[in-house]
């Protein structure tokens, strides 16, 4: 990447002029944003096709079911997805190609149990593609909902079921007002240092997040300094991001991104 920097003022001027995409490409941000995929991908919808080329016009070889996990071999460019000009990324998998927009990049990282859970709970993160919750701390207990890779949940205590030699984390869902149990090997306890405030020395009034709907880019500033620029997906019609100026006054881990209490697709 070229060692260039934009000030907050320059960035807003360029964004308003409609040349942001060109400038970011010149600065090398287009290449920087093309991070390599994870080693695995989880199918997010049922009936996702496998093609013999990275094109929706190519031959369909297979249909994947929801939550199927496949190994990702490479990232390639192909047809834009479903009329979205911002995403032309496809994944090469065994036997063909799949469109990236239908897959969640995931890893499978099993964890050792940690028994030290404070009275107020501790935040944990799902470290496998998908984990079923249970209504009790038993392998054969009735299943609850599914939790997906990268989602975070409050662990309230550790439960050891001696007769089946299993270890569980009890999590509490503040939307459903209910406790569930997750195998301890499927959750990573998040260290305190990962939850500390970013740049606490910078006043809140000097922090700005700029969402550019035209280029689908999110850029963060601390005063006049640009500290992050990354792609975003601002939503399609009906769930799109509204225009305007907004103040974020409350952010909290493990909050449902819905007002309907739907914990099924809790990503």
Language-model segments: residues:
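Gly/Pro-biased beta-strand-loop elements
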Residues: 184-267
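Boundary regions of SH3-family modules and the immediately adjacent low-complexity/disordered segments
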Residues: 20, 28, 89-125, 172-204
